[in-house]
């Protein structure tokens, strides 16, 4: 069985992680966050990529695609090896740019099926406010205004065109993410139940 993948995209603070956690509780999906995998790899003392990843994250830049895809592929393989019923994956925060997408298409062609893109659409103002609020408790080094401005610019320049590309293929499920967690999840449920 090939992994069945749903890409989860949206600006910083759009609620991707929160909604993915809800989906995992209610459906047979495994949540893989490209950012979390990179942060874990960065903090592993024996990691060959740790320092490299660290400098990219601090600068608000996108980590080289081979590193990210390697971590994603390894995580999917390990999950499916542990339990063959777990072949559905939510990949959150990837692909973030053209280079990511090309890398995925090259490396994963025929190895995984992308079902659709779940796009959490939210204004920049709401995203920034949410991240600053989260920064008070998350301890994330990139939840400050300066990093956020950079991350939003990166998102608008790099990730939005990817979403538009998938839209042309009719593969995007767009959700208004400016509403409450429950309202957003109600839309998510409708989409996933249609897909089942």
Curated annotation (Swiss-Prot):
CDD domains: ADK. Residues 33-63 are annotated as: NMP. The keyword Nucleus applies. The keyword Kinase applies. Residues 133-143 are annotated as: LID. It catalyses: CMP + ATP = CDP + ADP; dCMP + ATP = dCDP + ADP; UMP + ATP = UDP + ADP; a 2'-deoxyribonucleoside 5'-diphosphate + ATP = a 2'-deoxyribonucleoside 5'-triphosphate + ADP. PANTHER family: NUCLEOTIDE KINASE (PTHR23359). This is UMP-CMP kinase. It comes from Danio rerio (Zebrafish).
